[in-house]
């Protein structure tokens, strides 16, 4: 009986250690990269903690772009060295080299942006670097999940919250307007062909996308007004 108790205690202790290690590992690998809506929200904040989060986010993005630059450089070299070429070597390599150059440029801009927010987090005066507007708008950041969007919509109370939702709905409205144009073009292409009935389906999608764009635009305007009223 005593031996059985010891075995149970050892097993329980081992399970606790494994759980602790797993939690520590998860904490260590947690990504500092924010979603696009979080970036848009925090950019409007002067809070040191928010700026520290932005600094970590942009620094992590810079490393990602730097890795992509290295990858595209390696691809360019591989294309040039390959004995089997299905595309002109110079053309394919040039594409990869240009991508690497753009990746490097983005990485450098993001490092400057990370340093800017690091200074703001420390309370220092700093000037916004040039060319950072796309990254402040969420370029490079992942889209928020459904749960994250629902949580933000449910607790939105500050101007920053409403501004982030305004940006989200503006982006959604733009996407729906692009869908209107796409489905309109497809409807035109189908008319006069043997499958002209497909144009009717495209017309329905045009109408649906138009309504979606209208609602998203209205939601963006509402959050814009709420953001202004809360200042």
Task: Show the residue positions of the predicted features.
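Amphipathic alpha-helical coiled-coil segments
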Residues: 96-124, 176, 208-231
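Short E/K-rich amphipathic alpha-helical oligomerization segments
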Residues: 37-42, 68-95, 146-150, 177-203
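Non-transmembrane amphipathic alpha-helical segments
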Residues: 51, 55-58, 62-65, 69-80, ...
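Immediate post-signal-peptide N-terminus of mature secreted/exported proteins
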Residues: 25-74, 78, 94, 98-101, ...
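N-terminal secretory signal peptides that target proteins for export/translocation
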Residues: 1-6
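Extended amphipathic alpha-helical interaction segments
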Residues: 46, 116-192
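Hydrophobic packing residues in well-ordered alpha-helices of helical domains and bundles
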Residues: 55, 96, 166, 202, ...
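Bacterial N-terminal signal peptides
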Residues: 9-21
């Amino acid at each position: 009986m005593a031996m059985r108790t010891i075995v149970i205690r050892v097993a329980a202790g081992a399970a606790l250690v494994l759980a602790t290690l797993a939690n520590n590992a998860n904490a260590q690998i947690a990504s500092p990269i924010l979603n696009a809506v979080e970036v848009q929200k925090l950019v409007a904040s002067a809070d040191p903690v928010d700026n520290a989060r932005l600094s970590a986010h942009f620094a992590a993005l810079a490393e990602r772009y730097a890795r992509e630059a290295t990858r595209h450089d390696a691809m360019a070299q591989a294309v040039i060295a390959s004995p089997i070429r299905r595309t002109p070597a110079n053309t394919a390599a040039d594409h990869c080299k240009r991508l690497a150059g753009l990746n490097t440029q983005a990485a450098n801009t993001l490092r400057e942006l990370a340093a800017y927010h690091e200074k703001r987090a420390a309370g220092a005066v700093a000037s916004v670097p040039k060319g950072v507007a796309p990254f402040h708008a969420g370029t490079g950041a992942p889209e928020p999940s459904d749960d994250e969007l629902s949580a933000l919509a449910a607790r939105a109370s500050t101007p920053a919250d409403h501004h982030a939702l305004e940006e989200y709905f503006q982006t959604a409205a733009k996407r729906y307007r692009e869908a209107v144009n796409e489905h309109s073009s497809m409807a035109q292409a189908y008319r006069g062909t043997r499958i002209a009935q497909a144009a009717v389906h495209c017309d329905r999608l045009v109408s649906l996308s138009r309504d979606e764009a209208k609602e998203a635009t209205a939601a963006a305007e509402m959050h814009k007004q709420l953001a202004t009223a809360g200042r």
